[in-house]
Amino acid sequence: MIDNADILNASILIVDDQKANVQLLEQMLREAGYRRLTSTMDPHAVCALHRDNHYDLILLDLKMPGMDGFQVMNGLKEIETNGYVPILVITAEPGHKLRALAAGARDFVAKPFDLVEVKTRIHNMLEVRLLYKHLEQYNQELEQTVQERTAELRESEARFRRLTELASDWYWEQDENGH
């Protein structure tokens, strides 16, 4: 259902206060074939960017000055009304992993990170995210079909009701032979 071209065309936001990390992740993802990359070193900009672009994946550093990744995740939860916030956290703090997952992150990568592991986790998360989006779309189509069928059924019931009301006005006569 999801092919590699869909995954490579997914939108990704990279958020890290270290320019070297942003450049490394951008280069790695571009070399892997990803085409829709955005990055910011300003954690305050993340919510507005996501509100405008609805990224398929956000790579989020947890330790940033001014606003940490946990505060960013709380802001993103307010935007994503369906409860699914597509965040892969990047952290050097071992104690932050479980806290990040509990706060809504879907996965994490420990710094310093292994590029093969990061690419694999990104690919897997995007595959799940795109499948989730396909499922949402399919559910909407099913709901539309149910609404259409319900309307057709109501219309059919109304026609039947009108016919039975007319039939009660009719009367039948038979002769002695039953004709």
State where each predicted segment sits.
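PAS/LOV and related PAS-like sensory modules
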Residues: 2-7, 24-27, 140-179
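N-terminal membrane insertion elements
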Residues: 2-147
